[in-house]
Amino acid sequence: FFNLTEDNIYKSAVIKDIDSNIGQLLKTDAKFYAIHVSPSEKELRAMGNTEQEQAEAMKHYIREVFVPEYAKNFNKGLSEADIKFYGKIHFDRNGSDNELNMHCHLIVSRKDQTNKKKLSPLTNHKNTQKGTVTSGFDRVNLFQQAEQGFDKLFDYHRQQSESFDYHNTIKNGSIF
């Protein structure tokens, strides 16, 4: 596993760290969220020519783009350093005929690094200012920002038909 600053972290250390970062969570609360980062074959080619190059590029993307954007989308003034996460890169996908299949599984703690703030990317609140829940999480914005960050980091020239906005519009209708 890897996190923001380290590589080659043992599975037992990951389990212990996530399991101990649960202060004030209810028994019904999730201890962590599993996030899957799965580039297309074209995106993988932009990340490097070998599996090793692609894996290093994926770690760089997770650390420099995805986790910082994830943190920002809580609208709580968080940075990537506040997010407790571990990533594991895989090169195979069951049921896939693609030549390139690298993807990354992220385990993200429900609590921040200090074990004080509850974080949920599944909340439906978006940047609310009043009521019980202030802040929220904007999943659409996360996908847009992560995609733009990918394109900039790897100098990737995305076709409109490959974009999140395009697929989201096809799936859900109107762009407004």
Protein language model features and the residues they cover:
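N-terminal nicking endonuclease/strand-transfer module with a His-rich metal-binding environment
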Residues: 1-176
